[in-house]
Amino acid sequence: MLKCICRVYSQPLAQMVTSPLFKHMGSAGTYTILPITNLRHLSTKNCPLKIKSNRSEPLQFGDFERQVPCSRKSGSSKNVQKRLYELRQLKTVLSETFGVTEYASFFESLRNALHINNCSENEKKKLLYDIILHQHELYPEVARKIGFYLPGEVHRWFWYRIPKSESFNHYLFLLKSDVLLFTSNYCTRFTNRLIKGTEMERQLATFQIFLHDETNIKFIMEKVLKLHTFDSLIALVNGLVKAKNFRFIKVFIQALLQKLEQHCYSGKDGAKQKNLRYVKFNNTLLYYLLKSGNVELFIKTFQEELKFIVSSGLLNHIDGNEHILNFPIHHYLNLLRISNRQEELFNVISCLQSSPLMKYKLFKEFLMGELIASFQAFRDPKLVCKYLLSSYSSKASANILNALGIWGWLYHSKSTTLTAPTLARELKNKNNILPNTMRIGSPVTVPILTELYRSLLSSSSVSLESGQFKNCLLDLYYKYKSFLSEEAHKYRYWRNDTGILNVFLNYIRFQAREPRLAYNVLLDFYSQPFAKKVVLTTTLCPFSIVAYKNHTLTQAELSELLQVMHKNGVPLTFKFCSAMVMHYVKMRDEKGARSWYNKILFGGFEIRHMALIQIIKDQGWPFPKNFDETLLTELVENNNIKEPTDSTLFTDEDMFEEDGKPRFNDDDVNKCTNIIRETLKSLN
C-alpha cells in the first residue's frame, strides 16, 4: 500500500481522506495541532511501523554541504520553531502509523506553505524545508524503506525560486531527506543541471561523491535503489557510460540488476513488462561493453539479446517499444564503425533500409549518424553532403549549408553565398542516392553538421595551402557565428552546442598551428549574446583546447579565460585543470601548479593521466584517496612516459578519434549480421 501511495497518487490526497493532520491558519508558522486522542482515529488506512532507535548511519551528508546555507542551518521564525518542537512531541505516537491520511496531511502542509502571501521567498523555502525535514524525522522507518513523495508543484516552486548557485545544496537536502527523485520533471531538471555542471555537481547527481569511501557504498546504493526508478537509474548509468566514467560502474550495474529483480510484475501485461525491462537492462550492459572495449562479451550479449527478443514475442509489441531493437543494432553499427569495418556496416544498413524499423525517425537518425561518421575514413566531404541531402530535407538543409558558407567552399572552393535561384538550380542536379524509406524529412541536425565540418576541414587542410586554409577556417567561423545570431532561431530543432566550435578550435590550433588565433576566436565566440545558451554536450571543453600547452598565452590572458568561463557558467574540467598544472610546472611556478592540483583534488576528479601522475610524483604531492596505485607501477615500468601528444589528451574521443580500434574476427561479424537478418524476417 505504501508503494502505491508514494508512486501512484499524483492527485491531491487530501480529497480522499478526512481532515489533514495539520491545518494552516494563514501565517508563516502557525499550525493548529489536532488533539493526540484524535490522531489514530483520523488514519483511514494505516501501516504499522517499528522504530529502529539510535540507528547509526555510516555517512554524514553534512560533510558535503557547501557554504551556501540550506535547511535548518538557515533557521526559521520563532513561531515555526515552536510549532515544530511541538510536533516532535508527537513523534512516539505518529511513528507507529503511516497511511493515506498522514500523506494527505503532509501534502496539505506543503501546499499551504506555498500559498502564504505574507513572507519572503527565502522564508517560504525555509518553511518547506522544515516541513520536509520533520516529516523525515517523524517517520524514520518510512524514510529508510521507501522515501517520501513530494507534490509536483513543490518541485516546481523550488525550480523557479532556487538560484542556480544553490542547486548543489538543494539536491543534497533532497537526498538527506530521502525525497523520491524523478517523480517530477522539475526534480529531473535539477538532476540534469547538476550533471552539466562542475565535477562536484556531477558526482552529487550520480551519488559518486559519497562512494570514494568504501564503507559508504552499501548505505548509498540502498539510497540509490530507493530514490530512483528503474528508468531513471538506466538513464544515470547510460550517462556514466557515455562519459566513460567507469570508477563505480560495476556497483551501479549491480544496483540495476537488483532493481530489475525486485519489481513486481502482475496483470495480463506482466510478462511483457518484465521482458521489456530485461531488454532495457541488457541494452545498458551492451553500451558498457561497447564503451569499455570488451568486444568478445559484447558479441555474445548482442546475439543472445536478439534471440531473446524474437523468442519472447516482444516483436509483436514493437510499436511504442522500438527501442528494444533500435539500441542493440545502433550499438553494433557503432562497433563496426569504430573498428573501421565500413563494408560490413554498409551491408547491415542495406538489410535495414527496407525493414519496418525505418518508420521510426529516431532509428533513421541513429542510422544516418553512423553512416555519415563512417565516411570520415574517406576524407570526402562531397560524399557526406550527398548522403546528408538525400536523407534530410534537401531544400532546408541546402539553405543552411549555403548560409554557413559550406556550400561555397564545398562546390566552388571559395567563400561565396549563392542566390536562392542559383542554389535551387544546383540542388536540382544533386541526385538522391538513398531510398525513400531512409528519408528523415526534417532539416539537417547539428551533430550531422559537425561531421560535415570535420570532413570538409580535414580535406581542406590537405588540399589548400596554409594561407588559404586559414582563410577558409576564418570564413566558415564568421559565417557560423552570423548564422547563430540571425538564422538558427528559425529552425525548431536547432541546438546550440560546443561541437562545431570544438572542431574550429581543434583545426586552428593543431592543423593551422595558430594557438593565439584559437584564443581570439574563443573569446570572440563567448562575447556574443547567443553564447549564454550554448550547451557543453561533449566531455571536451573548448577552453581546454585553447589552454593546453598554449605557451603563447600570458598569465593575464589565462586569467581572462577563467573570467569568461565563470561569466558563461562553464565548469572547470579535469582537462582544463591538468592543462593549468602543466602550464605552471613549465613556468617553474610550484605554488601556481599546486593551486590548480588542489582544484583537481577538491573536484574529486579521477586521475589516470600518466604525465600528470609523473608530475605529482616528482613534486611530492599527495595522491587522492581513491587513486589507483597500480598506475604508479606502470609509471615505474615504463621509463618512456612522455607528455601526451596534442591529439591524445585534449581531443574528444567521440569527436575526433577513438581510443584504440576494437578487433573482432569475420566469423563474429557474419554471425551478428545473420542474426540481424533473421530478426528482421520475424519482424516482417
UniProtKB/Swiss-Prot annotation:
GO annotation, cellular component aspect: mitochondrial inner membrane
Transit peptide residues according to the UniProt entry: 1-56
Top-level taxon: Eukaryota
Membrane-topology descriptor: Peripheral membrane protein
A GO MF term: translation regulator activity
Predominant cellular place of this UniProt entry's protein: mitochondrion
InterPro entries in the record: Atp22
Record family assignment: Belongs to the ATP22 family.
Name of the protein described by the UniProt record: Mitochondrial translation factor ATP22
Source organism: Saccharomyces cerevisiae (strain AWRI1631) (Baker's yeast)
Lineage: Eukaryota, Fungi, Dikarya, Ascomycota, Saccharomycotina
